Regions:
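Short C-terminal boundary/hinge segments that cap the last helix of small helical domains
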Residues: 69-79
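Residue-level preference for short helical/loop micro-motifs built around acidic side chains
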Residues: 15, 34-37, 74
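Short, basic-rich loop-to-helix N-cap that marks the start of a DNA-contacting helix
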Residues: 53-63
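Residues within the helices of the helix-turn-helix
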Residues: 22, 33, 62
Length: 79
């Protein structure tokens, strides 16, 4: 039986998610502060996500996708 590195997978998905949030936010042309307002979240929370320092709830994932006007799955796609 193979053992997965759960912690490694967790770090990878946090990096993919945070990087995509930053990419799509910049493409949208909004600052972290304005984006946080659009999401109904605090600016430091957005910064922590983009800098890979925070895990995130499903509710907040949906808020972010809605504010970016994209499908949620795109935030988890590696390039």
């Amino acid at each position: 039986m193979m053992h997965k590195n759960i912690e490694g997978d967790k770090v990878d998905i946090i990096k993919v998610f945070g990087g995509n949030v930053r990419k799509y936010r910049i493409e949208k042309g909004v600052s972290q502060e304005k984006f946080a307002e659009l999401c109904g979240l605090h600016r430091t929370y957005i910064s922590d996500i983009e800098c890979f320092r925070r895990s995130i709830s499903l509710d907040n994932i949906q808020k972010i996708a809605n504010a970016l006007e994209i499908e949620t799955y795109k935030l988890f796609m590696e390039e």
